[in-house]
UniProtKB/Swiss-Prot annotation:
Name of protein: Elongation factor Tu 1
Family designation: Belongs to the TRAFAC class translation factor GTPase superfamily. Classic translation factor GTPase family. EF-Tu/EF-1A subfamily.
Residues annotated as domain tr-type G: 10-209
G4: region residues: 136-139
Subunit structure: Monomer.
Listed GO MF terms: GTP binding; GTPase activity; translation elongation factor activity
InterPro entries, per database record: EF-Tu_GTP-bd (IPR041709), EF-Tu_GTPase (IPR050055), EFTu-like_2 (IPR004161), EFTU_2 (IPR033720), G_TR_CS (IPR031157), P-loop_NTPase (IPR027417), Small_GTP-bd (IPR005225), T_Tr_GTP-bd_dom (IPR000795)
Positions of region (G2): 60-64
Lineage of origin: Bacteria, Bacillati, Chloroflexota, Chloroflexia, Chloroflexales
Gene name, Swiss-Prot/TrEMBL: tuf1
Organism field: Roseiflexus castenholzii (strain DSM 13941 / HLO8)
């Protein structure tokens, strides 16, 4: 059966839910699809379908990242539901990297919690441009003053992390009430908070300026072998565009020269696409490439547009203990993981002359040597991780090869 064609009629925006475990991110995601489905602007996706990470289903903790799609009158949205559990912050980094804007979900009775702070910090690090807040479970609070205090605390938290806390919209509501309602009337009072939220997302999160005219680049997130058709790589196009017949290179994660291949198809949401452009989440079918010849962490790029490098200088901020960072300094030769685009790569650190150690809270320029070359360029941002947590955030200042 021929696949449906994806029609591009509205601006496309990537959003996602972030926040502390059990504050209602997945319930809200399901509720959005339910309410918009009443307008014919989405397909309802249930809580269980979103929370479909079987090994963790028992504890009700979301681990995998789930993509849903929906529309408003103004835009077409791809929405990722991000894991809230600290162990899966790594997934959070891959998810948040895909956001033009975030919906921060905070349970009103609990207020901001450690993971709320960590997610806001990460959103800042991976440069999520804008955020709206959904203050959930307000039906469990009958004290208006307490609600206002929680809002105040949230605005302060956002401001402290470089977001405009005073102007960010905070929508109050109950995701569960909207999700469990049996009403088919879009004007039912329990649905109003969802409509208000989508309105805030439409109005407050800017339509991103896509880097369509730059050379094509897509970080590879996943690789699939399709019998009889070849190998498909998936990811979000960072810049440029790609269509069937284009020659591309697979760059990085190897000491060998980049491999050239030809694109034999592009798909989005299981529909064929004439051309994938910056900002799209796509699958790209590659000619003559074995499933084993390509891996997560590599990039697909216009030939010659980006090269793999192992050594670079970087400006790095080392998180304080209070921000979830290290409690102790580190020294030259420290070998953490560098989280670059879609993968962790081990690297060794050299410090500038006269610097003997780096304290939590320091800003420092360092020289990094990765164990394997990766597609990098000046201005690229990355996280430094150790033992499953973020200990620093950096930006590449110069390539040294």
């Amino acid at each position: 059966m021929a696949k449906q064609k994806f029609e591009r009629t509205k601006p496309h925006v990537n959003v996602g839910t972030i926040g502390h475990v059990d504050h209602g991110k997945t319930t809200l995601t399901a509720a959005i699809t339910k309410v918009l489905a009443l307008q014919g602007a989405a397909q309802f996706v249930s809580y269980d379908q979103i929370d479909n990470a079987p090994e963790e289903r028992a504890r009700g903790i979301t681990i995998a990242i789930r993509h849903v799609e929906y529309q408003t009158a103004k835009r077409h949205y791809a929405h990722v539901d991000c894991p809230g559990h600290a162990d899966y912050i790594k997934n959070m980094i891959t998810g948040a990297a895909q956001m033009d804007g975030a919906i921060l979900v905070v349970s009103a009775p609990d207020g901001p919690m450690p993971q709320t702070r960590e997610h806001v910090l990460l959103a800042r690090q991976v440069q999520v441009p804008a955020m709206v807040v959904f203050l959930n479970k307000v039906d469990m609070m009958d004290d208006e003053e307490l609600l206002e205090l929680v809002e105040l605390e949230l605005r302060e938290l956002l401001s402290n992390h470089g977001f405009p806390g005073d102007e960010i919209p905070i929508i109050r509501g109950s995701a569960l009430a909207a999700l469990s309602s049996t009403s088919t009337d879009i004007n039912a009072p329990e649905y109003q908070c969802i409509l208000d939220l989508m309105n805030a997302v439409d109005e407050y999160i800017p339509t991103p300026v896509r880097e369509v005219d730059k050379p094509f680049l897509m970080p590879i997130e996943d690789v699939f072998g399709i019998k009889g058709r070849g190998t498909v790589v998936t990811g979000r196009i960072e810049r440029g565009k790609v269509k069937m017949g284009d020659t591309v290179e697979i760059v990085g994660m190897s000491h060998e020269a980049p491999k050239k291949t030809v694109v034999t198809g592009v798909e989005m949401f299981q529909k064929t696409l004439d051309e994938g452009i910056a900002g799209d989440n796509v699958g790209v079918l590659l000619r003559g490439i074995e499933r084993t010849e390509v891996e997560r962490g590599q990039v697909l790029a216009a030939p010659g547009s980006i090269k793999p490098h192992a050594k670079f200088k970087a400006n790095v901020y080392v998180l304080k203990k209070e921000e979830g960072g290290r409690h102790t300094p580190f020294f030259p030769g420290y070998r953490p993981q560098f989280y670059i685009r879609t993968t962790d790569v081990t690297g060794a650190i050299s410090l500038p002359a006269g610097v003997e150690m780096v304290m939590p809270g320091d800003n420092i320029e360092m020289l990094v040597e990765l164990i394997v070359p990766v597609a990098i360029e000046e201005g690229l941002r990355f996280a430094i991780r150790e033992g499953g947590r973020t200990v620093g955030a950096g930006v590449v200042s110069a390539i040294v090869d």
